[in-house]
């Protein structure tokens, strides 16, 4: 496919008048001295170009998207319409009096998320999951500083979400990793062995990135709190537990949620996202400002939090994402519980269908996702997990997350979400079985995949280390 620059040779987009425009009033330092080298195409050619680009992409509306730990569920299109209503298209610096509708929505979303998590206070400002993580860890850091305790360590299980170590490190903590037990859960003895007065918190995902529920979470909570430490809940996998349990019940002190995952706002390609952070009562004054409050007469932005960590983002978060998430919650109501039920059901169905054909390192009941391994295929025929992922692209399926979590060799992390019906799941099972059989009988066919995509094999190392981002003649 040609770039838009290559398509512009010999064409014009807009023909400007020949009349000279006086630009003498412009300062010399803002006047361009060289050609812009911008492409020029007709409107029709521009439309065709971007339509062609869109046809090269894969999206949830096109086919199955079982990207583990990403919750690529269907995003109701009516929510896009609601987020574009004129009343929400206001400047973030308008006064509270002129933003009552937007502030009311934010207040109601705060209340809804607090009810779902049973936490006590919340901020909507963080704009991504990892941003929420860092916000939560900054709250924990300031809490201990304010009570005069110099705690320097954060415990992170090897089954935690991938961005947890970076978030804790960027907040000034040292990382202490603990290994999982034979069931793929936090090893209590390993936790006890590293738990001392230097430990500020533990960061956990429950269910963890193996898709396994941490059945000893109450014991972990007791041990941490007896040590004066806090528990951080990464909400990456919250789609598995809505209506059945919640972070407060499990003993967590700080929670972040991914609205772009659990609450069905479009994501991928870098955003947009939202990672609200909720806390227990003793931490509410540490939240970033402002939070939205209500005095019985009007909604207002509250900056009066005496121990606040300050602002973590300009303005008040990714507002359009908040609108879509709130619309989703209203649409689903009590059926949020059924969303989790079906997500767990779909994952267990796939796991049972596929474990005969691929290794299953932790054969435990899973929640919303599960992790297979391509070790068998690699050992028998040299077909790696990466090759399996490439072959899936020929079956109108987005590859699952691969090589994560790191504790599973040749990992294949599959999350079907609640959106998919049995026929789609069966098609995926059939494709995965076919790949496993072909890997045995004709491995070269899998090793050379994909065969039907517009772009075949690419040099991923070259693309990552030396990206070519600029067009030149």
Show the residue positions of the predicted features.
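General small-molecule cofactor/ligand-binding pocket signal
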Residues: 123, 176-178, 400
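Conserved PLP-enzyme active-site core in the AAT-like
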Residues: 101-104, 131-299, 307, 382-383, ...
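Short, flexible loop/turn elements at secondary-structure junctions
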Residues: 71, 128, 160, 208, ...
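Short, well-ordered loop/turn and helix-capping segments at boundaries between secondary-structure elements
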Residues: 142, 146, 170, 197, ...
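Non-catalytic terminal extensions of PLP-dependent enzymes
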Residues: 1-120, 245, 295, 299-312, ...
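Conserved phosphate/anionic-ligand binding catalytic regions in large, soluble enzymes, centered on
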Residues: 58-78, 125-133, 263-278, 316-327, ...
């Amino acid at each position: 496919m040609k770039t838009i620059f290559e398509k512009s040779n010999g064409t014009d987009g807009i023909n400007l008048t020949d009349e000279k425009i006086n630009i003498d009033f412009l300062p010399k330092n803002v006047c361009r001295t060289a050609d812009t080298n911008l492409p020029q195409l007709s409107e029709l050619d521009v439309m065709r170009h971007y339509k062609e680009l869109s046809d090269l992409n894969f999206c949830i509306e096109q086919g199955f998207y079982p990207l583990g730990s990403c919750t690529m569920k269907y995003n109701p299109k009516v929510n896009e319409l609601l987020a574009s209503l004129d009343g929400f298209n206001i400047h973030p610096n308008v006064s509270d009096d002129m933003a009552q509708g937007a502030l009311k929505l934010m207040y109601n979303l705060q209340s809804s998320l607090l009810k779902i998590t049973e936490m006590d206070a919340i901020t909507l400002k963080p704009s991504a999951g990892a941003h929420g993580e860092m916000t939560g860890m900054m709250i924990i850091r300031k809490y201990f500083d304010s009570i005069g305790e110099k705690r320097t360590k954060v415990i992170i299980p090897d089954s935690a979400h991938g961005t947890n170590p970076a978030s804790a490190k960027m907040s000034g903590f040292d990382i202490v990793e603990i290994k999982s037990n034979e069931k793929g859960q936090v090893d209590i003895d390993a936790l006890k062995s590293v738990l001392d007065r230097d430990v500020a918190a533990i960061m956990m995902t429950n269910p963890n990135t193996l898709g396994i529920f941490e059945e000893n979470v109450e014991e972990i909570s007791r041990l941490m709190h007896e040590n004066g430490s806090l528990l951080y809940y990464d909400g990456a996998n919250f789609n598995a537990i809505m209506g059945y349990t919640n972070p407060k019940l499990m003993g967590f002190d700080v929670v972040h949620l991914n609205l772009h995952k659990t609450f069905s706002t479009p994501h991928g390609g870098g955003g947009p996202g939202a990672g609200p952070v909720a806390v227990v009562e003793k931490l509410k004054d540490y939240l970033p400002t402002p939070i939205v409050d209500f005095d019985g007469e009007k909604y207002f932005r509250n900056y009066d939090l005496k121990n606040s960590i300050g602002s973590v983002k300009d303005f008040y978060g990714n507002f359009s994402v908040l609108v879509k998430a709130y619309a989703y919650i209203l649409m689903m109501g009590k059926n949020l519980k059924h969303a989790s039920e079906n997500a767990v059901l779909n994952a267990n169905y796939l796991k049972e269908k596929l474990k005969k054909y691929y290794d299953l390192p932790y054969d435990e009941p899973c929640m919303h996702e599960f992790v297979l391994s391509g070790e068998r295929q690699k050992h028998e025929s040299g077909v790696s997990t990466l090759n399996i992922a490439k072959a899936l692209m020929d079956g109108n399926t987005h590859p699952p997350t691969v090589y994560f979590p790191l504790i599973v060799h040749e990992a294949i992390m599959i999350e079907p979400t609640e959106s998919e019906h049995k026929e789609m799941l069966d098609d995926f099972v059939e494709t995965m079985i076919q790949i496993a059989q072909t890997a045995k009988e004709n491995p070269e066919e899998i090793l050379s995949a994909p065969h039907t995509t517009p772009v075949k094999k690419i040099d991923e190392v070259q693309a990552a280390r030396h990206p070519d981002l600029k067009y030149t003649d």
